[in-house]
A protein has these predicted regions:
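Sec-dependent N-terminal signal peptides
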Residues: 3-14
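C-terminal edge strands of extracellular/lumenal beta-sandwich accessory domains
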Residues: 21-32, 55, 83-87, 91-101, ...
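Extended extracellular/luminal ectodomain segments enriched in beta-structured repeat modules
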Residues: 50-52, 60-68, 216-222
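Mid-chain, structured segments of secreted extracytoplasmic proteins
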Residues: 67-111
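Extended, solvent-exposed segments with strong compositional bias
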Residues: 41-45, 109-154, 249, 256-274
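Extracellular beta-rich ligand/substrate-recognition surface
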Residues: 41-52, 199-204
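Sec/Tat signal peptide C-region and signal peptidase I cleavage site
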Residues: 15-20
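A mature extracytoplasmic/lumenal domain signature
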Residues: 63, 71-75, 165, 227
Length: 326
């Protein structure tokens, strides 16, 4: 995988706007990340299977200026979040760096178990209902990029942020931005972000298609996608440079669906485009929260880069010219 990434960098095959890091990013067209409180009966039918979500920010080693991790709408209340009865939820944001923050195997799994909070805790804050931060930004930092875990594989430093419900049963909808500024969203050149399990809110309109982009490395022969609580809200379609549009199994209310399919040679070293297409009839599903992950044939989780490696994959039509006999 390291070789593939280095080749892509050398050839300039990353997207032209590989800068900064809004999460979700523009090309994903996802309105919000989603995490529920997880208190009481730990009800999962609202669309969150484990009440915890981890994201990783990757900063190239040549970038040495201070960075900030900003959270939009970090509180639980107001007009953006999803109420369940009355606002009673607490949400904790924790940022980790140092040895093991990314490299510990538990940090790269889907469930918040064992040593998933690996690394050195750099900052943490818990929010409840807070009108000041409703539809506003809270900023963690500054952090020296060297405080993240250095990885030779990516030749950069990685920070981990875990957002986790600490009681209550309301839904927290939020976004991140990795910035060079405390009070503005200013890009960190060359940065990227990724997760291994994406928990997010779907749009409430059928004309918006959301995307996630798992990267296929050179050891991948097949992948298995797992999605949770899709509510039969349309289709999940997979597109690549050689895959025109393959639909995969989708889940119903409060359950999982999975499907495995083979990887085509031309997809190695590229990203897949998982497209989330809402149904229009007999009605549009509102406030749909979903969870998805993808594993390779070795059982390893694939990274969902918010800025897809190699760019957004586009199907390449194979136009063949056939000579007509006279």
């Amino acid at each position: 995988m390291k070789i593939v990434l280095l080749i892509l960098v050398f050839l300039g095959l990353f997207m032209p706007d590989l800068m900064g890091q809004p999460v979700p990013a523009r090309d994903e067209n996802i309105p919000y990340l989603m995490t529920f409180g997880g208190g009481g009966k730990r009800e999962t039918s609202w669309g969150d299977d484990d009440f915890s979500q981890a994201f990783f920010f990757e900063i190239p080693e040549e970038f040495t200026e201070p960075v900030y991790i900003r959270v939009f709408d970090p509180d639980i209340g107001g007009e953006t979040d999803e109420i369940n009865g009355f606002w009673d939820t607490k949400m904790e944001y924790s940022i980790y760096g140092g040895k093991g923050a990314y490299s510990d195997p538990d940090a790269r799994e889907t469930q918040p178990e064992n040593n998933y909070r690996s690394g050195t805790l750099l900052a943490t804050k818990t929010f409840g209902e807070d009108k000041y931060y409703d539809n506003n930004w809270y900023t963690f930092g500054p952090f020296n990029p060297s405080e993240g875990e250095y990885t030779q594989e990516y030749q950069g430093h990685i920070f981990k942020i875990i957002t986790e419900g600490k009681g209550g049963d309301d839904g927290n909808l939020y976004r991140y931005f990795l910035s060079t500024s405390f009070d503005e969203n200013i890009d960190v050149e060359g940065a990227n972000a990724f997760t291994y399990e994406y928990s997010f809110r779907m749009w409430n309109t059928a004309d918006n298609i959301s995307h996630i982009y798992p990267f296929i490395d050179d050891d991948c022969l097949s992948v298995k996608q797992e999605n949770f609580d899709w509510d039969n809200d349309g289709w999940i379609r997979v597109v690549s440079v050689v895959r025109k549009g393959q639909t995969v199994k989708v889940s119903g209310e409060d359950n999982w669906a999975e499907e495995e399919f083979n990887i085509i040679d031309e997809e190695i070293g590229e990203s897949l485009d998982f497209q989330f297409i809402k149904r229009k009839t007999p009605f549009v599903v509102k406030n749909n929260n979903v969870v998805i992950s993808v594993r390779n044939n070795y059982g390893e989780l694939l990274k969902f880069y918010t800025i897809p490696i190699g760019g957004v994959p586009k199907y390449k039509y194979d136009i063949k010219v056939r000579e007509i006999e006279k």
